[in-house]
Swiss-Prot record:
The modification Phenylalanine amide is found at F37. Expressed by the venom gland. Antibacterial activity is decreased by serum. Antimicrobial peptide that acts by inducing concentration-dependent membrane disruption, implying a membrane-lytic mode of action. Acts with potent activity against Gram-positive bacteria (MIC=4.04-16.16 uM) including methicillin-resistant S.aureus (MRSA). Its activity on Gram-negative bacteria is controversial. GO terms for cellular component: extracellular region; membrane; other organism cell membrane. Belongs to the non-disulfide-bridged peptide (NDBP) superfamily. Short antimicrobial peptide (group 4) family. Amphipathic and cationic peptide with an alpha-helical structure. It comes from Heterometrus petersii (Asian forest scorpion). The lineage of its organism: Eukaryota, Metazoa, Ecdysozoa, Arthropoda, Chelicerata. This is Amphipathic peptide Hp1404. Residues 41-69 form a propeptide. Residues 1-23 form the signal peptide.
Amino acid sequence: MKTQFAILMITVVLMQMLVQTEGGILGKLWEGVKSIFGKRGLKNLDQLDDSFDSDLSDADVKLLREMFK
């Protein structure tokens, strides 16, 4: 029983170490993939940045008001 508990504790510690370093490892792998393909191969697919633009023009406000009538 003591041996099983010791093996369980060692396994838990090793799994925690793996989970904590996994982000760093996967991040480095992704940087390597991005460097292989370059900027042209991998474009920024996050198109939500434009939807959070805080500067609304008068035309934008007018369009929004017409949409929500």
